[in-house]
Amino acid sequence: MTAQTTLEQRRFNMIEQQIRTWDVLDPQVLELLWQVRREEFVPPQHQALAFVDMEIPLRGQHEEAIRLGQIMLNPKVEARVLQDVLPRPHEKVLEVGAGSGYMAALLAARAQRVITLEIEPDLVRMARENLQKAAVRNVEVREADGAQGLAAEGPFDVIVLSGSVAEVPPALLEQLKVGGRLAAIVGEDPVMRGTLITRTGDATYTTTQRWDTVAPRLLHFPEPSRFRF
């Protein structure tokens, strides 16, 4: 068995054993997971973890990476988010939390254009290099704090928050087009929900929460007040 065969077998196992069993069944999503090579976005020192059911640290030790939100999300979480918002070929997408660039690459394989924001300079460089090597040309990686989105480039058809938040800031919702979708992981450890918000009118939105998970925080998003008595 060649190294390439082993790699493809591991990818197959990830899709069949982790992702399909988590109700990710859209054939377009499953095809993207075959096409976009996850291992090309994983740090060299963690290549053995590319298809493992876990978060992968992008910088430093695992605990520190979790605290700073500098990770690749679990593969099944990435796939579920992608299925929830699946962009159309004419759509413009905003991602907050570029990380290694993998989610942006998945989104870009469907969308017309993706802008992804990353606050950590080292990860900005990593994402840009990974996307360039993968020949993904319709993604722009910007070094920026994404907690308030990117109103100057809006409105967007799709917004993806690649990490967890206590709540979705109104400023981000206002940057959705009518008919646009926002995906986020919302809540507090140990109870977080995969959340899909659709803008249905100028001031109306629908929210569905379809699945449970836990993910590291995105930096600088508001946290709920904690009163002590």
Place the predicted regions along the sequence by residue.
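Conserved nucleotide-cofactor-binding alpha/beta core module
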Residues: 82-205
